[in-house]
Regions:
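… and, occasionally, acidic/histidine-rich disordered N-termini of signaling adaptors
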Residues: 2-168
């Protein structure tokens, strides 16, 4: 029926907006030719996003999972993605960046320690790759870092903190 079509069209339009915030895969491949992206969101729009930005001699990569599914998750992903972009202007240290995002999300969503406060936020793994020093720095909120070294099939896991970004 007409109402169902309007909802579907609206969700498809929201997907185009959400996709526009994702970095182009070709850009990532151009800088990291042996990389790949495994991005399989559950719904047309979702709370999942990946992030990539080259800033000076550093590359920042993130994989994030925001609270909520579908449209509410998509709203959260746009809010969290924007806070990540803003935090990168203030610091290049992954731990500091996550702290800045945490404060920003809590302020934006008016989260307090009260029971009535929303518990929305995100889990994230954030890496900074220093191209000159050939060094990776990582910080994570509930999302660990998985490393597979060249020529190996072994997965090395670096655990994240057991706290999410935002009101948890």
């Amino acid at each position: 029926n007409r109402q169902h079509k309007e909802i579907r069209d609206s969700i498809n339009y929201a997907e185009r907006i959400q996709s526009a915030k994702l970095p182009p895969k070709e850009e990532i491949k151009g800088i990291l030719p042996q990389s790949f992206i495994l991005f399989l969101p559950k719904d047309v729009v979702s709370g999942d996003f990946y992030f990539f930005e080259k800033k000076h001699e550093r590359i920042f990569i993130a994989a994030a999972d925001c609270t909520g599914h579908g449209v509410p998750g998509a709203f959260m992903s746009l809010i969290c993605n924007e806070h990540l972009t803003v935090a990168l202007e203030k610091s290049s240290n992954p731990g500091e960046i996550l702290t800045i995002i945490n404060k920003g999300i809590k302020t934006a969503l008016r989260q307090t320690d009260s029971i009535e406060s929303t518990k929305d936020g995100m889990d994230i793994a954030l890496c900074s790759i220093d191209l000159q020093k050939r060094r990776i720095e990582y910080a994570g909120a509930f999302n660990p870092l998985w490393i597979i070294r060249d020529g190996s099939t072994e997965v090395e896991v670096i655990n994240a903190t057991r706290r999410s970004i935002g009101g948890f």
